[in-house]
Amino acid sequence: MTKNIHDVAYELQKAIAENDDFKTLKESYAAVQADAASKNLFDEFRTMQLSLQQKMMQGQEITEEDNQQAQEVVVRIQQDAKITKLMETEQRLNVVIGDVNKIIMKPLEELYSAQQQA
């Protein structure tokens, strides 16, 4: 009997939620949200990040001023231990999710590789 792919996806969702890095990420995010200075800085960083992404998606040039502002925010972020921990944990979780994505996409990769070799 074939498993329903959506059921497997929900199992994966549950496994991610139970992952130690995800639990640490939730704790780190709560710590950032509980500290007004960290929260404000994190919100500023996210706003800047989204603005730069939007500019890139619209084909707009990222100016020297944009780069300078981003660098200044990054320097301040690196000085905030709570945000640094949050970002490091998020990066570890992103690696896990990237690995899972490679596994999920393997059948398509093999299909297209076989097509090119034929």
Curated annotation (Swiss-Prot):
UniProt-recorded name of the protein: UPF0342 protein BALH_0781
NCBIfam families assigned to the protein according to its UniProt record, in alphabetical order: PRK13676.1-4
Family: Belongs to the UPF0342 family.
Pfam families to which the protein is assigned, alphabetical: Com_YlbF (PF06133)
Recorded superkingdom: Bacteria
Biological classification of the source: Bacteria, Bacillati, Bacillota, Bacilli, Bacillales
